[in-house]
Design a protein with these regions (language model features):
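Short S/T/G/P-rich N-terminal loop/turn motif that feeds into the first structured element of a domain
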Residues: 1-93, 100, 104, 134-144
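Short, Lys/Arg-rich amphipathic alpha-helical interaction segments
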Residues: 96-98, 102-144
């Protein structure tokens, strides 16, 4: 079964239908390919680059666009194991990116410079989850 690397059209349309003028936080869960899967014709095709190295290239090359739209990474964790969920599900990277509003995220993913750099992410990722959240003030107990 192919992993989720890029959003489906219906998912992206649903994202765009949500409010665009409020802050958002995006939970990223990423499972990497052992070897990056660059397409033929890409300068890194066949070089034996790891998925992690390709993802780091994505992070480095897209950082200027991410910063330009006002994005910032607010949490990073190293996944250690699944406590609840499919036993065979694992993630290599986990982080939350925050944007001043959904419009900033849309500006980033449609930016021509970013679209060139995202090829590293596409080569790096075997499977991923990207989940949008509206930031809220935490309460005293779980779910509050």
């Amino acid at each position: 079964m192919a992993g989720s690397i890029d959003p489906l059209r219906a998912q992206f349309d649903a994202f765009k239908a949500l409010p665009r003028d409020t802050p958002i936080q995006m939970l990223n869960l990423v499972r990497l390919n052992a070897l990056a899967a660059y397409p033929e014709g890409h300068p890194n095709h066949g070089k034996g680059m790891s998925g992690l190295d390709a993802y780091r290239a994505y992070g480095r090359t897209s950082a200027a666009v991410f910063k330009r739209v006002g994005g910032r990474q607010i949490w990073v964790g190293e996944p250690e194991g699944v406590v609840t969920g499919p036993a065979d599900e694992h993630w290599d990277l986990a982080f939350i990116a925050e944007y001043p509003d959904a419009g900033a995220f849309l500006a980033m993913v449609t930016d021509p410079e970013y679209r060139e750099h995202v090829k590293h992410r596409q080569a790096a990722v075997e499977d991923s989850r990207l989940i949008r959240f509206a930031p809220v003030e935490a309460g005293e107990g779980f779910g509050e």
